[in-house]
Amino acid sequence: MKFVIITGLSGAGKSQTVKSMEDFGFYCVDNLPPALIPKFAELCHQSQGVISRAALVIDIRGGMFFDDLFESLKELEHLGHQYEILFLDADDEVLMKRFKETRRSHPLNVDGSIENGITRERELLQELKDRASHIIHTTKLIPAQLKEELRNIYVEGNQMNNLMISIASFGFKHGIPLDSDLVFDVRFLPNPFYIEELKDFTGNDVKVRNYVMNSPISVEFSNKLHDIVSFLIPHYVQEGKNQLVISIGCTGGRHRSVTIAHVLYHQLKDKGHRVTLSHRDSGETRERKKES
């Protein structure tokens, strides 16, 4: 079991960090009293692998409970769990500006001075900062850049595998799926609907797929579609996107769109991407899924 203790200056980006860590598959808890860390670790252990990575935000909002942190970390280590400390920092001027923009008061703002609150907080957190495994300065980082910094630290292996690609076929006469990121119209391809022996089948049947893909236009389009999607994927990942919904439509959503969606699904699956396939309007309930 791996724990990441997220801490740092108020206004330095801890809330944004939690959102990113959740996207990376961490179970996140904000403002957990430090004394409860060992108990939380025990609960995670009882989950039998359901929770394998957790990120806990611990900061001076805990007040008097914050003093229990180092003792709790020592106990966590004694229980055989790994942990590391992620410390978020930023220039005082930037922190003050962020507080003013959000119109929030500093947690240690007892005399009306944000600056004094930041100074006091730095003093209280110095030992924790000295023990940090990673320190990220967010002064010049926008949220997407912060997420990329976190990705470089906490995401192992092929970053493309963090993007879930959902491919869905549909029929335009039933409406475009509202959650689509990319929509492709394949109504220009040969239509099996007008072939008597094929009209009652769908693109999930080999003979329908063979009919559609027997056209050079279909082959060329499917290859170009794969090329454009392959080009876009790393750029979406770089922007921090975690899910990509590709909708492919024909008139009724039973033949051409199902066929092209099927082809694209297998092209991306063979490249090792996490991809799911569904057919909204095919009249069938089957759905193929693959995560790798």
Swiss-Prot record:
Pfam families, per the entry: PapZ_C (PF22740), RapZ-like_N (PF03668)
Any one GO MF annotation of this record: GTP binding
Binding positions for ATP per the UniProt entry: G8, L9, S10, G11, A12, G13, K14, S15
Domain of life, source organism: Bacteria
UniProt entry keywords in alphabetical sequence: ATP-binding, GTP-binding, Nucleotide-binding
Cited Gene3D superfamilies: P-loop containing nucleotide triphosphate hydrolases
Residues where GTP binds: D59, I60, R61, G62
Keyword Protein biosynthesis: no
Membrane-spanning intervals of the chain: none
InterPro entries the UniProt entry points to: P-loop_NTPase, RapZ-like, RapZ-like_N, RapZ_C
Keyword ATP-binding: yes
Entry's family note: Belongs to the RapZ-like family.
Biological role: Displays ATPase and GTPase activities.
NCBIfam families with a match to the protein in the record: PRK05416.1
Name of the molecule in the record: Nucleotide-binding protein Amet_4092
